[in-house]
A protein has these predicted regions:
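Membrane-interfacial helix-loop segments of redox and metal-homeostasis proteins
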Residues: 1-248
Length: 248
């Protein structure tokens, strides 16, 4: 699942972020193609994972006594201190980049500093809120729940207003090719994230939280993206670069 999703995301010019959550607010047609194809891929994968092949056999064992949950305060304190040190280190780095690092020509502030600041904020928010784009898509077909999907849509509405204001100030939006690559990539991405149980965002913060399953998904994702990079030159023109970049 990770390999399929990684390959699909890159051939589609972005994952659930670049070709959906931030792609649609930037008015790029390719993001709409990718999103619709992703929904189809999610639906197909939801049918596939319901097959007996993917159903784990559960063996129920009678419990004779309760085992209390033990906590290790010292271990928790160590990880808290490490987290604080990492946060302080990143903050110092950002301040240094903004205050002392020479900025590229035509830039008023370091792009790396802005990227790091936004990355830290985004990672903290999706981790604490447990935002999962996979469940937002998958649950529509599997359980009928739409809470996460509604939350994502509201976020995109707010993002659209913000992006539009920047466009009015003269900042160009990120518009990608609206070609077959987005449809192929969207389908593969949607299928892969359901099979893997996590999307590009979800596996990252869950892997850091210690969920070993998502370490494997992440490795597969890197493999899939690498396969795309190695083979991109063979089909870039017929599938992507020969098609127009359509700005809505």
């Amino acid at each position: 699942g990770g390999i399929i999703a990684g390959f699909g995301a890159r051939i589609g010019m972005g994952c659930n972020l670049a070709s959906f959550f931030t792609g649609i607010p930037q008015f790029s047609v390719h993001a709409w193609f990718f999103t619709l194809a992703t929904l189809v891929g999610v639906w197909v994968a939801a049918q596939v994972v319901s097959l007996p092949l993917f159903r784990s056999k559960v063996k129920l064992v009678a419990a004779t006594e309760q085992k209390p949950i033990t906590q290790n305060p010292a271990r928790a304190k160590i990880f808290f201190v490490l987290g604080v040190l990492v946060l302080v280190g990143i903050s110092v780095w950002i301040v240094w980049l903004m205050a002392f690092k020479p900025t590229p020509e035509g830039k008023n502030i370091s792009p790396l500093a802005i990227a790091m600041l936004c990355g830290v904020g985004f990672g903290f928010i999706i981790s604490r809120a447990q935002i999962c784009f996979t469940s937002a898509f998958r649950d529509l077909f599997v359980t009928g729940r739409g809470m996460m999907a509604r939350a994502v849509i509201v976020g995109m509405m707010v993002s659209t207003i913000g992006v539009f204001s920047y466009i009015m100030l003269g900042m160009p939006p990120k518009i990608m090719w609206a070609g077959p690559n987005t449809i192929i990539g969207g389908f593969l991405f949607g299928f892969g994230i359901v099979l893997a149980g996590g999307c590009e965002c979800g596996w990252m913060y869950r892997a850091v939280e210690g969920q070993v399953h998502y370490w494997i998904v992440g490795i597969g994702n890197v493999i899939g993206a690498s396969l795309l990079a190695l083979t991109w030159d063979y089909y870039a023109e017929p599938l992507a670069t020969s098609f127009p970049r359509i700005n809505l």
